[in-house]
Amino acid sequence: MTNLRKTHPLMKIINSSFIDLPAPSNISSWWNFGSLLGVCLVVQILTGLFLAMHYTSDTMTAFSSVTHICRDVNYGWLIRYLHANGASMFFICLFLHIGRGLYYGSYMFLETWNIGVLLLFAVMATAFMGYVLPWGQMSFWGATVITNLLSAIPYIGSDLVEWIWGGFSVDKATLTRFFAFHFILPFIIAALAGVHLLFLHETGSNNPSGLCSDADKIPFHPYYTIKDILGVLLLILVLTSLVLFSPDLLGDPDNYTPANPLNTPPHIKPEWYFLFAYAILRSIPNKLGGVLALVLSILVLAVVPFLHTSKQRSMMFRPFSQCLFWILVADLLTLTWIGGQPVEHPFIIIGQLASILYFLLILVLMPLASLFENNLLKW
């Protein structure tokens, strides 16, 4: 009798995706982040579901409902901090996953890469709306500042902002719709992740060498299932350590003050994972220019496959491209630091230089380095 997992309509999909999937024999731990992102998404959906059972999306009671969750609900504090810090872990895994894709040339799988960029936008939108829900000072002012950016769009801008707000300012209608969107988007993300995986399995995984690995494939189970479980255990270890020892390490103290439209915090800044984009936004003195730069800072990823000029796929054997890649990483860390600083003399110019360098590296320097390396090989 044939195995049920190979014949059952549902089981055979799971089988061909996670059990009998032919995988390259040399993929490193950098390939673990896809499964870690899946785990993060499941954790976020589950903790979010339990939080939604006790949360009220009303301006009068939102802040106190979060307090109620932390004080009165059984393990409510744990669920709340798992959700908040789970978002940080999600973004750490996302950035490492994207970095891996850039380094090893995984962006050459066009459909998979473009759905990935779409996923990044969806996750960023979800995280932004989630940050508004506790209705603290930074929630309110973050929502006001970021939604206000849409007013920079010519002709329809101001109408668009009022349409999103559901009034003339960030208020009850805004909070209610943000909660609705924050609840539905993770399920859309899960569906997109399924499509992401579908396209990946059309081609098979890339590997560190960037060469075709069809001649040397191994089954996903048990080799990579056990490897993924190790990654998941490490992720859980880091997340629980963060939640149980310093749950507010990555948060903003201002968000423990209830939202007050009459009192602006001295420094309005988003969560740490948006700081790099926020720094790029602030580095351009023009409002529309800043908004365009903000969108392009993420959208530039979609252009990367078309700027691949190298004869080799991976950066494994390309020292000049490697050097530029690590400069890009350092530049992003610099932008993250600048995004959290006040708009004062040394920080303004550093932010502007780092923003210019960011676009210059991706759009100009890395493609040129690839051409140079091609010539070194005398091809």
Curated annotation (Swiss-Prot):
Subcellular location as annotated: Mitochondrion inner membrane
- Which terms in the GO cellular component ontology are assigned? mitochondrial inner membrane; respiratory chain complex III
Q: What would you give as a GO molecular function for this chain, any one?
A: ubiquinol-cytochrome-c reductase activity
Binding residue positions for heme b b562: H83, H182
Any stretches that span the bilayer, and where are they? Answer: 33-53, 77-98, 113-133, 178-198, 226-246, 288-308, 320-340, 347-367
Q: Which UniProt keywords apply?
A: Electron transport, Heme, Iron, Membrane, Metal-binding, Mitochondrion, Mitochondrion inner membrane, Respiratory chain, Transmembrane, Transmembrane helix, Transport, Ubiquinone
Cofactor(s) needed for function: heme b
Kindly state what the record says about how the cofactor is bound: Binds 2 heme b groups non-covalently.
How is this protein positioned relative to the membrane? Multi-pass membrane protein
The UniProt entry, under SUPFAM superfamilies, shows: a domain/subunit of cytochrome bc1 complex (Ubiquinol-cytochrome c reductase), Transmembrane di-heme cytochromes
> Has keyword Ligase?
no
Query: Which GO biological-process labels does this protein carry?
Result: mitochondrial electron transport, ubiquinol to cytochrome c
Family membership, please give it: Belongs to the cytochrome b family.
Note on file? Heme 1 (or BL or b562) is low-potential and absorbs at about 562 nm, and heme 2 (or BH or b566) is high-potential and absorbs at about 566 nm.
User: What is the name of the protein in this document?
Assistant: Cytochrome b
